[in-house]
A protein has these predicted regions:
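C-terminal catalytic/motor cores of large multi-domain enzyme assemblies
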Residues: 1-270
């Protein structure tokens, strides 16, 4: 049957290149249901709560502070080795529409454990809403994607195989999910060593989380421990930060608002 040939757009070409780069990574998966009731209660109090991508990015990076293996990548050049990075680099999958075509682009958040949760969320939202030219990570990957195939292949080989560049280009872990589109179990692919995906939070306070990892770097025992640590961090450090944001919201509501051009007291108490 005769069809129509269509040109591959740059965002789609990026996915093609990513899948080629991911095909040699021996991924293994482990899924678990986490009880995050305390986190959900704290988040539910906020008028503008941070998204779950930001929450999981920061929580995983906090766990990785004391687990160097979660900041380790496998590299082939100049010889096969493990390369440990000093801090986490999260690659968050951003779903957006470019020229009428749905696409997914990775936003880099460097050291999310060192940033306020609101800042992590701001970086993710900026990547979703701003033009591609205004997002540094997008500009970087789009420049590589527009290269002719021989040069593009060389750039990918350098990024994949040199230890330092692998961390710079693909991060130490990725965060993705389809919770915003109804949820489901997502077995994603990435050249990076770890991929965390999450489902929709359930009314009973649980959420299904999957971690896929490069089996060359670690084994299932560590990942099983990571789930327990992740659950604890979500319900303690992250929940505490969310409650702090609620306190800030309440304080802002109680503060008087100055009316422009008003005389006398010039305030309206809210």
């Amino acid at each position: 049957m005769r069809g129509t040939s269509k040109k591959i757009s740059p965002p789609r070409r990026l996915i093609v290149d990513l899948m080629l780069a991911s095909r040699d990574v021996p991924f293994v998966s482990l899924a678990r249901s986490l009880n995050i009731r305390a986190l959900l209660e704290a988040r539910g109090l906020l008028a503008q709560p941070p998204g779950f991508a930001a929450i999981f990015a920061k929580a995983f990076a906090i766990v990785a502070r004391d687990e160097p293996t979660l900041r380790t990548v496998y590299a082939k050049w100049p010889w096969p080795c493990f390369y440990e990075l000093p801090r986490s680099m999260a690659m968050v999958a951003i779903a957006r529409v470019e020229d009428g075509e749905p696409c997914v682009l990775p936003q880099c958040v460097c050291g999310p454990d060192r940033l306020a949760l609101t800042e992590v969320d701001r970086l993710i939202r900026h990547a979703k809403e701003a033009p591609i030219a205004e997002v540094p990570m997008f500009r970087k990957i789009m420049r590589a994607t527009h290269l002719p195939w021989p040069l593009r292949r060389l750039a990918w080989r350098i990024g994949l195989n040199f230890a330092r560049q692998r961390g710079n280009w693909f991060g130490t872990f990725a965060v993705t999910g389809v919770a915003a589109y109804g949820g489901g179990e997502l077995q994603a692919l990435s050249p990076g060593p770890y991929i965390l995906s999450f489902d929709v939070a359930k009314p009973d306070g649980s959420i299904a989380v999957m971690i896929r990892w490069d089996h060359r770097v670690t084994d299932a025992a560590l990942i099983a421990r990571v789930f327990s640590q992740l659950e604890q961090v979500l319900n303690t450090e992250i929940a505490t930060e969310l409650r702090g944001l609620r306190a800030v919201e309440l304080k802002a509501l109680r503060e008087p608002v100055r009316v422009a051009g008003a005389r006398g007291s010039g305030h309206l108490g809210l």
